[in-house]
Each structure stands twice: as structure tokens, then as C-alpha cells.
Amino acid sequence: MLVVKKTPKIKGILSAPPSKSYTHRAVICASLANGVSNLKNPLNGADCLSSAHACEMFGAEIDLNDEKWVVRGSEFKTPDNIVDIGNSGTTLRILTGISSQISDGYTVLTGDDSIRKRPMQPLLDALKQLGLNCFSTKNNGTAPIVVKSGKISNNVVEIRGDMSSQFITSLMMTLPFSENDSEIILTTPIKSEPYLNITIDVLDKFGVKIDKIEEKNKVGYKIKGNQKYLPCDYTIEGDYSSASYLVAAGVLLNSDIVIKNVFKDSKQGDREIIEIVKKMGANVEINEDNVQIMGPYKLKGIEIDVTDIPDLVPTIAVLGCFAEGKTVVYNGEHVRLKECDRLAACTTELSKMGAEIEEKKDGLIITGVHKLNGAKLKTYHDHRLVMAFTIAGMMADGETVIEGEDSVKISFPDFVDKMKSIGSNIEVI
């Protein structure tokens, strides 16, 4: 458990952890490339290590170090055993598609209790459109998933754009193996598009090209066939999702902090956290590779469309508790499909602290109360809730006890140590 007490001031320089999204994609691309790739500044978090270990089961050789992963990639082979991806939905979804392109045999992918509840049916249906054979062993669209190797026989696939972007990423990373050019057609407007831009960016670095289709009656992506993944040296940038908790702490508390390893020109959608706190009234300075904050700031409630930034919702919910007026979060139906139903979880747990928060079908309405009280909070094995609630606890009167703090190893393994280094009053017990 994590015990958090009111923190009077934070001060110091700290780095945002490497991007989870970029690390996942880079290690899988490198594993598919015939040759040696050097991945610098990878995230050594549980989810990304799940991707690395899964790729090793498909035949990649990976030397894992804190500052660099050396990946010797090759054509994927049939795994000798069931591929257990732990708690990583990204790993499960990307490798479900790619495992269909091994030369022979079957792949079985599964994970922990949480993963075995995450929806997979839209991806399975899309792969079946391509002529591939895959299914849920429970016949309910969840893991364990069985995938049979096979050739892609149809080159147009339709899929909703408003479910999980990970389904589309899986198709993007699988279709370059087709003998013919392919199209992914989106049947509904895209949500979480920045994650697809990250996929396209990483694929480009590893030699795979994807073009966007933007026609009057057709939106999607075009992928040339017979493309080869090529090895490269790749540096992974800092993670704006993880940096959002540092930003929130900086604008709410008496602070003087510099957050390094976040880039002004990043393609990450969650860089929007900077614009959000500015619109709420914070004078945050964004430089080429760092953010400077000298708080606290008097915040005002605003309306925020979270279509492309679902991972920021817990951070926004905490900010809204201390803002003047109402903070409205909308277009967030997909936020319910993360590690837990984050809309329900934020409502339930922050209310225990005295927050005035209303859950809507697609979002939240938070009325600023300016003061929270310590409470015992559940986090539903969700790393983002642990970190967002920590910031709430640092602002609250009394003591806040947060369960499940070990889940931060997924995306920000040294979160507690870094927060303590700048003066946060937190302890693991």
C-alpha cells in the first residue's frame, strides 16, 4: 500500500520515464527485422517487458539492459509454449495479428485475470475478414486466443474506429506481410488517433510505410504488400501520459520543478496535458525537451474532449477537483475499456475523498471543491489510477492510503522514488 500525506512543497529536476507506447512498438518491429537493432532509452516496465519476452518466444534474441535493448530479429517461428503476456493489452492485441504470419502451426496467447476480461472480438472479426483463422477458447471474445498461421487472402478489412486503437495498430503491423496491397477501412470516426500516428511513425523508422486514406466516402489506411521490417538504431522519447502526473502536481502544489525528456514536437496525443493546464489557468513553460512549472496556480474548470486522450482522464479528474467551477470530460466511452472502467473508478474513489463528481455515459462532470480529505482508495490494478490518486492525496487533508501501488511498474517503475526526490510526502508500507 501507498500512504500519502499532504505535501507543502515540491522542488527539483526529474525525467519523465520512456514512452510505453513507443517501446512496445519498437521492440516488436525490431524483433520482426532481420538483423540487429539498438533500442535506446526503453521503458523497463512490466508491460513492455511482456512484449520483449513474448518476442523472444517467437525467436527474437534480446539483451535487456536499463539504458539499451539490443534486439536480434528474424522471421517469427511457432512458440514452444503458450505465450503469457501478463497484463499487457497492447502486447496481446499486436501479437494476435502478427502471430498469424508465422510459417506454420498455432499460437496461443493469454494473460492475467484482467487481460482475460479485455475485449478482443473486434480484432478477431477483422482478422477473419482477411481470411485468417483465430478464435477465443471461451467463445466469448476474450483471451485465451488461438491463432492459426495462414496467408492473408482478402486485402480490404473494415473495423470500427471508435473502439480500441490497438486493434487497428495490430492490423497495421500485420498487413505488410500480405502479398498484395491492403486497405483498412474505418466504419466510424477515429478515437485515440494519436496512438495510430505513433504506430505509423515507428513503422516508418523500421522501413514499413503506411498511407492515410481521406476520401469523401472512405477513411482509413493503405498498406503496401511484401514490405520488410528493417533493423535500425532507435531512441525512445519520454512518456507524456506518465509526465501528466508530474504536471498536475506542479500546477496544484507550491512547486519549482523541471520535467525533462518530454519533447515539444512529440506525436503523442497526451502532450495535450500541457494545453489543458494552460487553458485551466496555469503558466507552464514548454521548451524543446523539457517543461518548467512554478506553482501553484488558480485553476478554472473547462470542457475537455478526451476522444484522443483517454489515458489523461484520471489526471484531469484530479485537476478538476481543485478548479473553480465545473470541469466537463466528454467523448470518453472508450475510457471504460482500459485496465478498468476508469470513469466509474474515478467517480467512486474520488468521491470517498469528498470530491463532487458525476459519472456520465461518456465522461465526467467534476465540480471543484478546493479541498479533499484523506481516504482509503482502491485502484483496481490500474497504474494510472495509482498515480493520479497519489497527486490527490498530496493535496488532501489527513492521510490517503492507496491499494495496489505495485501496478505502477507497468509504466512508471520508479514513480514513488521520483516523487519522493522532489519532496512528496509518500511512503510504501
Curated annotation (Swiss-Prot):
Its EC number is 2.5.1.19. This is 3-phosphoshikimate 1-carboxyvinyltransferase. CDD domains: EPSP_synthase (cd01556). Pathway: Metabolic intermediate biosynthesis; chorismate biosynthesis. Monomer. GO terms for molecular function: 3-phosphoshikimate 1-carboxyvinyltransferase activity. PROSITE patterns: EPSP_SYNTHASE_1, EPSP_SYNTHASE_2. It holds the Pfam family EPSP_synthase. The active site is at D311. Gene3D superfamilies: Enolpyruvate transferase domain. PANTHER family: AROM/DEHYDROQUINATE SYNTHASE, PENTAFUNCTIONAL AROM POLYPEPTIDE. It catalyses: 3-phosphoshikimate + phosphoenolpyruvate = 5-O-(1-carboxyvinyl)-3-phosphoshikimate + phosphate. Phosphoenolpyruvate binds at K20, G89, R118, Q166, R342, R384. It comes from Methanococcus maripaludis (strain C7 / ATCC BAA-1331). GO terms for biological process: amino acid biosynthetic process; aromatic amino acid family biosynthetic process; chorismate biosynthetic process. Keywords: Amino-acid biosynthesis, Aromatic amino acid biosynthesis, Cytoplasm, Transferase. Belongs to the EPSP synthase family. Its main location: cytoplasm. 3-phosphoshikimate binds at K20, S21, R25, S164, S165, Q166, S192, D311, K338. It is found in: Cytoplasm. NCBIfam families: aroA. Catalyzes the transfer of the enolpyruvyl moiety of phosphoenolpyruvate (PEP) to the 5-hydroxyl of shikimate-3-phosphate (S3P) to produce enolpyruvyl shikimate-3-phosphate and inorganic phosphate. InterPro entries: Enolpyruvate_Tfrase_dom (IPR001986), Enolpyruvate_Tfrase_sf (IPR036968), EPSP_synthase (IPR006264), EPSP_synthase_CS (IPR023193), RNA3'P_cycl/enolpyr_Trfase_a/b (IPR013792).
